[in-house]
């Protein structure tokens, strides 16, 4: 199975490399060439999921608006690029060029005041480079005629500073000039002249590195300090766990194996893991569901590895519109073959039939919760008129991808797993017909305590880095340190495996042979802590409103559910290898 998974991973890496090559910008311009500036969306600063189309607000517009043709990933990302009245020709400076003269009605003014109070920002794209700006500002309270007042201003002048190298655009920044503000504190109609300026400057920076400016935030001293403490915290937990494992294997378990193998009768009489050798490999309950979890968890693990490969090759950089979501759709579809292959391979070791049920369950285990949550969130977005609402055509495309590509790949993996998968499982000892009765357990061997500990230890080692990830996903901090993220993920895998092995050994030492499902729960429960921390993160943030709350909880649930399946699978596989090793090392009668 390892060779099959390696082959699939190689195909994915080749595909992601091809995707990344196609995503690069290679636009060349001559002086005076028109370079279109597209307006994208607007929204409150603290609610990243609550965005609306640019022209939903009473900005300058003239005639029909041309919508830019977008990719699937851009639509899923909530991008809605449209043409604008801004004319930024290559290497052509402009000073106080009139964009439009607009009469703001009382309703327009009320709308602007409302969005300015919520710190609305706008986003634009120029030669695939993002730029932002604020709509207006609120000035401090003042007292007049015994009443408290607040001043609202709208920015009427926008400055563009563009850097170029030879015939390519390298960087663009926008500045809302505070010298040109219009007071809209009163509900009276007002005429506003919107203007803009453009200045071009030569730079020595190459076009290949023009996106690096969006990564510099990750190397801010404060960010580096947080990463350092996260690294130190992870290393501390890993070292402590390595010491515990060394004690377990080098002293306690090794002595048990030696004494049991040489026929020490006193050792044989002791209660412990040795007494359940004829039950520990008994076919677990709900084998189809267990194999489906293993298949889906392995699929998602391969997908995560492929994403890291994309990040390290530089194809997943900040604000590369839709690249991440496009990659996720393609890679999840292709890795469905892994889910079918893995679930069938494990199922065939215990039962010679009913593998089809495992494949079907693997096909719905993650997609069904995903589509349910997506449908609810899409309904909420449609109600609010947000750009996160998926058009009908996009929904049809997603359904077609799932039915015409995802399901066939899943079935193909099931066929390959049935024919070329793992051989029938041969336990080191014969399995008794009747299961051994499980004696009463001490409190530290009970399921609740073990599952809690199995989730808490790995989470405590990565909590600082997990906070940074939340801040990147739901704030405006840029997480572009794939090396640190990969290190954190490796630590998470190591701790989930190690803690799973230790807890499985403790469970078997209490003569409790039903370890299969508990090992999955112990590993996956880390994701429950992650979701709980996500709720705490939301409560401490400035996010508000039902739309943002629903998207935050929904997407966080999907992320943590995926990690539950991945970490549960890792914990199970580590426990399975450990159990096979210790029972093969014993000379059973």
Curated annotation (Swiss-Prot):
Its membrane topology: Multi-pass membrane protein
Free-text tissue specificity from the UniProt record: Expressed in the root cap and in giant cells.
Subcellular location: Endosome membrane; Golgi apparatus membrane
GO CC, one annotated term: Golgi membrane
Motif (Golgi retention signal): 587-589
Lumenal-side positions: 25-227, 313-321, 383-394, 472-482, 540-550
Major place of residence: membrane
Cleavable signal peptide: 1-24
Family annotation (Pfam families): EMP70
Biological process according to GO: response to nematode
Domain of life: Eukaryota
Induction record: Up-regulated upon nematode infection.
Keywords carried by this UniProt record: Endosome, Golgi apparatus, Membrane, Signal, Transmembrane, Transmembrane helix
TM helices/strands, residue ranges: 228-248, 292-312, 322-342, 362-382, 395-415, 451-471, 483-503, 519-539, 551-571
Motif Endoplasmic reticulum export signal: where in chain: 578-583
Topological domains, Cytoplasmic: 249-291, 343-361, 416-450, 504-518, 572-589
Domain comment as written in the entry: The C-terminal KXD/E motif functions as a Golgi retention signal, certainly through the binding to the COP1 coatomer.
Similarity comment text for this entry: Belongs to the nonaspanin (TM9SF) (TC 9.A.2) family.
Protein name, as recorded: Transmembrane 9 superfamily member 5
Species this protein is from: Arabidopsis thaliana
Protein's gene: TMN5
């Amino acid at each position: 199975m390892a060779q099959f998974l390696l082959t699939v991973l190689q195909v994915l890496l080749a595909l992601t490399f091809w995707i990344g090559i196609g995503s690069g910008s290679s636009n060349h311009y001559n002086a005076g060439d028109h370079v279109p500036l597209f307006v994208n969306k607007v929204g409150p600063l603290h609610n990243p999921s609550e965005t609306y189309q640019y022209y939903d607000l009473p900005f300058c517009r003239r005639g029909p608006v041309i919508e830019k043709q977008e990719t699937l990933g851009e639509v899923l990302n909530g991008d809605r690029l449209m043409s604008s009245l801004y004319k930024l020709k290559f290497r052509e400076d402009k000073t106080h060029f009139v964009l439009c003269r607009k009469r703001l009605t009382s309703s327009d003014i009320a709308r602007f005041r409302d969005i300015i109070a919520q710190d609305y920002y706008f986003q634009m794209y120029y030669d695939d480079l993002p730029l932002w700006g604020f709509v207006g500002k609120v000035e401090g309270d003042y007292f007049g005629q015994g009443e408290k007042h607040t001043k609202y201003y709208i920015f009427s002048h926008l400055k563009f500073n563009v850097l170029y190298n030879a015939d390519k655009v390298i960087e663009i920044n926008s500045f809302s000039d505070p010298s040109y503000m219009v007071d809209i504190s009163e509900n009276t109609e007002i005429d506003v002249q919107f203007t803009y300026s453009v200045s071009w400057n030569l730079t020595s920076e190459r076009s290949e590195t023009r996106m690096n400016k969006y990564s510099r935030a990750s190397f801010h001293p404060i960010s580096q300090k947080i990463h350092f403490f996260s690294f130190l915290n992870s290393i501390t937990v890993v070292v402590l766990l390595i010491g515990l494992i060394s004690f377990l294997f080098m002293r306690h378990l090794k002595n048990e194996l030696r004494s049991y193998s040489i026929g020490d009768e006193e050792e044989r009489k002791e209660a412990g893991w040795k007494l359940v050798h004829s039950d520990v490999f008994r076919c677990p309950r709900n084998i189809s569901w267990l194999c489906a979890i293993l298949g889906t968890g392995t699929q998602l693990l391969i997908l995560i590895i492929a994403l890291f490969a994309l990040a390290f090759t530089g194809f997943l950089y900040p604000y590369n519109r839709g690249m991440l979501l496009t990659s996720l759709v393609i890679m999840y579809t292709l890795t469905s073959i892994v889910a079918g292959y893995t679930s069938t391979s494990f199922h065939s070791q215990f039962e010679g039939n009913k593998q089809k049920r495992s494949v079907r369950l693997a096909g719905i285990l993650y997609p069904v919760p995903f589509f349910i949550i997506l449908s609810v969130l899409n309904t909420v977005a449609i109600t609010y008129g947000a750009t996160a609402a998926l058009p009908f055509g996009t929904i049809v495309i997603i359904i077609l991808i799932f039915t015409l590509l995802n399901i066939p790949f899943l079935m193909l993996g099931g066929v390959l797993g049935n024919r070329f998968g793992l051989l029938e499982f041969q336990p080191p000892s014969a399995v008794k017909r009747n299961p051994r009765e499980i004696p009463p357990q001490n409190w530290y061997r009970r399921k609740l305590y073990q599952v809690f500990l199995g989730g808490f230890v790995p989470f405590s080692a990565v909590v600082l880095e997990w906070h940074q990830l939340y801040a990147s996903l739901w704030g405006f901090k840029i997480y572009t340190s794939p090396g640190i993220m990969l290190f954190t993920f490796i630590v998470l895998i190591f701790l989930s495996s190690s803690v799973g092995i230790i807890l499985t050994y403790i469970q078997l030492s209490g003569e409790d042979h039903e370890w299969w499902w508990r090992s999955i729960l112990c590993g996956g429960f880390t994701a429950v802590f992650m979701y709980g921390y996500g709720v705490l993160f939301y409560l401490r943030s400035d996010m508000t409103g039902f739309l943002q709350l629903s998207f935050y909880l929904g997407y966080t649930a999907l992320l943590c559910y995926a990690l539950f399946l991945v970490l549960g699978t890792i914990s199970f596989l580590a426990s399975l290898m450990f159990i096979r090793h210790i029972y093969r090392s014993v000379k059973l009668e």
